[in-house]
From Swiss-Prot:
Protein name: Regulatory protein ViaA
Primary location recorded for the protein, binned into one broad class: cytoplasm
Gene Ontology cellular-component annotations: cytosol
Top-level lineage group: Bacteria
Claim: Translocase is one of the keywords in the record: no
UniProt-listed HAMAP family: ViaA (MF_01626)
Keyword Chaperone: yes
Keywords on record: Chaperone, Cytoplasm
Classification via InterPro entries: Uncharacterised_CoxE, Uncharacterised_ViaA, VWF_A, vWFA_dom_sf
Gene name, Swiss-Prot/TrEMBL: viaA
Subcellular localization: Cytoplasm
Assembly, per entry: Homodimer. Interacts with RavA.
Pfam family, one: VWA_CoxE
Function: Component of the RavA-ViaA chaperone complex, which may act on the membrane to optimize the function of some of the respiratory chains. ViaA stimulates the ATPase activity of RavA.
Length: 483
């Protein structure tokens, strides 16, 4: 079967001009003109996409097969070119019959040329073939234009859908022209309106929490700061975590003698019910010799001191990917869940604007991951936002997964962000040591986004920076009042 590309080569038909005309007609359509006027960023993104459109149209024209009737007529024309005038005169009745059988537009004109001349001279032979070729060129051009018109309608429909999607998500995810280009590339997937409305919903929630969005921007841009000490620098408050004596109970460490009634062993408490041993119980209570559970922990408090400001100058530094770990335990449900998802959406916005990768991991009893900056980033974001936080907390597995991922070359300068209320078990020593190694030798930065004021300081002390966003009712009311 003859392909359209072969036919164009045989008849010297140039499809490039037709492709350019089709693209110009598409871009000048009234629908796109209105959208371009409203959103210049989308116009720039589509302009950058034009080379891909041209290549797709060329591929489409190459793969199409020519109708059998046109193929047969072209083959007959090719054979007729090889005949001499006497041979052509002999084959002329069969050629005319073929043209009429194929319903060729040239059939009537060919018959008129034969009937209008008593002698079939070599000049008439040449004229016959020239007009026949011209008819074939017109048929091939018409066929090309029909295909391009179908492609134009399909492409226009696709562009309108993608522009509608991009227009809806632009306020949520677009911060500059770079992000607009990424969003346009992501919009190529098969998405329905009800799907991406979930992103719009959390975008609206983020707009109602300006402090949360500001926190995400500070975290995302935190690598810009370069410390430059100056003699005349003003003083600033410097916060450090100071270790206190082990007065905060975290876990059972064993048994010891004390007067702690709340942590008595059951056998000691049973002596109160025996009259002969009651005085003995009180004696041991006074002397702090009762057997009780020993609960120990590591208590840390925040110490505020004054020091000269060291962050005076700002110099752009390389920014690596985000590896964001989100706690999906039951305590992170409700408002905490909304804040965590909206925060990840804000980090996705920063990643698109700065050409950074954004990798989300949900940690509970198992690890589920999504990459929001990949070509299918919108679909991945929708799947992430559709998750429900109802599991347990396995912070150690989360850190092990982060450590394993940071071993790869493409993540050598990644920033890890852990979003949790940090109400969990203490991290194993081997995990803590590996994190410290990554921080010291590879300059990886670990950020904690604390959604509660009751997180365990013993867990959070391994982070380079702690970003606090208390979701308690009191803090929420205070933030609302300050607005």
């Amino acid at each position: 079967m003859l392909t359209l590309d072969t036919l164009n080569v045989m008849l010297a038909v140039s499809e490039e001009g037709m492709i350019e005309e089709m693209i110009l007609a598409l871009l000048s359509s009234p629908v796109l003109a209105v959208i371009f006027e409203k959103s210049p960023r989308l116009k720039k993104a589509i302009t950058n996409d034009l080379p891909r459109w041209r290549e797709a149209l060329r591929t489409r024209l190459k793969d199409v097969h020519v109708p059998p009737e046109l193929t047969e007529e072209v083959m007959c024309y090719q054979q007729s070119q090889l005949l001499s005038t006497p041979q052509f005169i002999v084959q002329l009745p069969q050629i005319l019959a073929l043209l009429y059988r194929l319903h060729s537009p040239y059939a009537d004109q060919a018959q008129q040329l034969v009937d209008g001349n008593s002698r079939f001279t070599p000049a008439l032979h040449t004229l016959f073939l020239q007009r026949w070729r011209l008819s074939l060129v017109v048929q091939a051009t018409t066929f090309n234009q029909q295909l391009l018109e179908e492609e134009r309608e399909q492409l226009l429909s696709e562009v309108q859908e993608r522009m509608t999607l991009s227009g809806q998500l632009e306020p949520v995810l677009v911060d500059n022209d770079n992000a607009a280009g990424h969003l346009w590339d992501m919009s190529a997937g098969q998405l329905k309106r009800g799907d991406y409305q979930l992103i719009v919903k959390y975008g609206d929630f983020l707009a109602q929490q300006p402090e949360l969005r500001q926190l995400a921007e500070q975290l995302g841009r935190s690598r810009e700061a370069k410390s430059v000490p100056r003699k005349d620098a003003p003083m600033e408050a410097f916060r450090t975590l100071v270790r206190e004596p082990a007065t905060v109970p975290e876990q059972v460490e064993g048994l010891h003698q004390s007067d702690d009634i709340l942590r008595l062993l059951p056998p000691e408490l049973a002596t109160l019910g025996i009259s002969e041993l009651e005085y003995e119980f009180y004696r041991r209570l006074v002397e702090k010799q009762l057997l009780t559970y020993r609960l120990q922990g590591e208590a840390w408090r925040e110490k505020i001191t004054e020091r000269p400001v060291t962050h005076q100058d700002f110099e752009e530094q390389p920014r690596g990917p985000f590896i964001v770990c989100v706690d999906t335990s039951g305590s992170m449900g409700g408002f905490n869940e909304q804040c965590a998802k909206a925060f990840c959406l804000a980090l996705m916005r920063i990643a698109l604007a700065d050409n950074r990768r954004c990798f989300i991991m949900l940690f509970s009893t198992e690890i589920v991951s999504y990459e929001l900056s990949c070509p299918q980033g919108i679909e991945q974001a929708i799947r992430f936002l559709s998750q429900r936080f109802r599991g347990g907390t396995d912070l150690a597995s989360c850190f092990r997964t982060i450590i394993e991922r940071m071993q790869g070359r493409e993540w050598f300068d990644a920033d890890a962000v852990v979003i949790s209320d940090f109400i969990a078990q203490r991290l194993p020593d081997d995990v803590v040591n590996k994190v410290k190694t990554l921080q010291k030798e590879h300059q990886h930065r670990f950020h904690a986004v604390a959604m509660s004021a009751h997180g365990k300081p013993g867990i959070m002390r391994i982070f380079d920076h702690i970003w606090r966003f208390d979701t308690g009712m009191r803090s929420r009311l205070l933030r609302r009042w300050r607005r």
